[in-house]
Amino acid sequence: MDMRVPAQLLGLLLLWLPDTRCDIQMTQSPSSLSASVGDRVTITCRASQGISNYLAWYQQKPGKVPKLLIYAASTLQSGVPSRFSGSGSGTDFTLTISSLQPEDVATYYCQKYNSAP
């Protein structure tokens, strides 16, 4: 029995910060994917200019508010399963799900920020 799990991803996320000199574009890839339960899944996020480690990852399920997974690029929010991990600094960031579970079907967002989210 094929237990493929689709995961929707946000392909492009533009955010504006009023105290920055120019807008920083955040681009995620892939824009969508299909994976099986147990697979290792990697989502990347690229900033148009360096943002140090001021990056958060969110998970949003239909009809629910976004849930913070990771902040400061690699710090796991309390209560988030250890199969989620984040890495990167500067312009290139990665969210990894080490072993995909059915409950991980969601939309995933990266977001830059100026201080703790």
From Swiss-Prot:
Coiled coil (UniProt feature): none
Superkingdom of source: Eukaryota
Record region (Complementarity-determining-2): 72-78
One GO term (biological process): adaptive immune response
GO cellular component: extracellular region; immunoglobulin complex; plasma membrane
UniProt keyword annotation of Cell cycle present: no
CDD domains: IgV_L_kappa
Region: Framework-3, residue numbers: 79-110
Pfam families found in the cross-reference section: V-set
Keywords on record: Adaptive immunity, Cell membrane, Disulfide bond, Immunity, Immunoglobulin, Immunoglobulin domain, Membrane, Secreted, Signal
Domain Ig-like: 23-117
Membrane recorded as keyword: yes
Disulfide bridge positions per record: 45-110
Subcellular location: Secreted; Cell membrane
Framework-1: region residues: 23-45
Main subcellular location of this protein, as a coarse class: secreted
Region (Complementarity-determining-3): 111-117
Region (Framework-2): 57-71
Annotated stretches, region: Complementarity-determining-1: 46-56
Signal peptide coordinates: 1-22
Subunit structure: Immunoglobulins are composed of two identical heavy chains and two identical light chains; disulfide-linked.
Function summary: V region of the variable domain of immunoglobulin light chains that participates in the antigen recognition. Immunoglobulins, also known as antibodies, are membrane-bound or secreted glycoproteins produced by B lymphocytes. In the recognition phase of humoral immunity, the membrane-bound immunoglobulins serve as receptors which, upon binding of a specific antigen, trigger the clonal expansion and differentiation of B lymphocytes into immunoglobulins-secreting plasma cells.
UniProt protein name: Immunoglobulin kappa variable 1-27
Gene: IGKV1-27
